[in-house]
Amino acid sequence: MERDLERGPPGPPRPPLGPPLSSSIGLALLLLLLALLFWLYIVLSNWTGGALLVLYSFALMLIIIILIIFIFRRDLLCPLGGLGLLLLMVTLLLIALWNLHGQALYLGIVLFIFGCLLVLGLWIYFLEILWRLGATIWQLLAFILAFFLAIILLIIALYLQQNWWTLLVDLLWLLLFMAILIWMYFHGPRHTDEHHHDDSLPHPQQATDDSSHESDSNSNEGRHHLLVSGAGDGPPLCSQNLGAPGGGPDNGPQDPDNTDDNGPQDPDNTDDNGNTDDNGPQDPDNTDDNGPHDPLPHNPSDSAGNDGGPPNLTEEVENKGGDRGPPSMTDGGGGDPHLPTLLLGTSGSGGDDDDPHGPVQLSYYD
């Protein structure tokens, strides 16, 4: 089974109503041919059988109709073929009533009335099926009028007992059932299922694209929402692409030994002017041995009130550790103005600056 690239893989297949076997079709065609021959012999012969001739001819026509339904629309055998079969049984009962007498005749009449009621009920049920399939009021009225007209003409044929009238009545019944078959072919379930398309369902390709976009957004969100924690006995773990030069200030909780002599940010702990590089970004010329990654000069009287502290490297700084500026958390990275916003802070409840054992959490958001 080929897949529809627009709708994706097909769902579980429905059990189809397979075509009849070739042997059964051949047998049905043979029976249909024999029924046509018998019907033509009865109608076109000079045999005068009276009302029984009309009933035999009508019974053969019903057999022909049932065989046609079996060959071309086997799925309609239950409603439409059942209607023809019930009409055939009522016709055979009426033929039997022609030779009955006494109590058997009365019982046969009761059965005949019961059979006629069954035919009427099955016809109403079939009209309801046509209504559910989309038949209009005018189409239903046309079928109802044709059905009752065929019954009235059959009664007239029983009264006239003429072969030519019987031929017309039988052809009218055949035309009625053929009209129903043709209508069912264009409006029945088999025809509508082939062109049915449910647009309420999401397109599989669209669902795949939505999921891919969602996964991309989740991955981007995961890249931009980082949390870096450090233990109390060592420097915090930080990304090398996010930080600023220099180490933490003296006496800061982020520097275990309170000095930056042995920090990874400055290999020789000196700058170009021979000054020690204990506090990193506070060099006079704002340069060190590691190159041009030092931040720009800062204003000692800025709004941060750090009195010579490190420059404000981020757009938003949350410092719960004290009045000193936040320590540098990376080694040698430059103060790129295009870096994401850093959010720095300690997890201590009281903001104790002298507690070196408090875990440090660092996160940033775009």
UniProtKB/Swiss-Prot annotation:
Keyword Ribosomal protein set for record: no
Statement: the UniProt record of this protein carries the keyword Nucleotide-binding: no
Subcellular location field: Host cell membrane
Region ranges (Disordered): 194-366
Stretches with biased composition (Basic and acidic residues): 210-224
Similarity-based family: Belongs to the herpesviridae LMP-1 family.
Designated name of the protein: Latent membrane protein 1
Taxonomic lineage of the native organism: Viruses, Duplodnaviria, Heunggongvirae, Peploviricota, Herviviricetes
Gene name of this polypeptide: LMP1
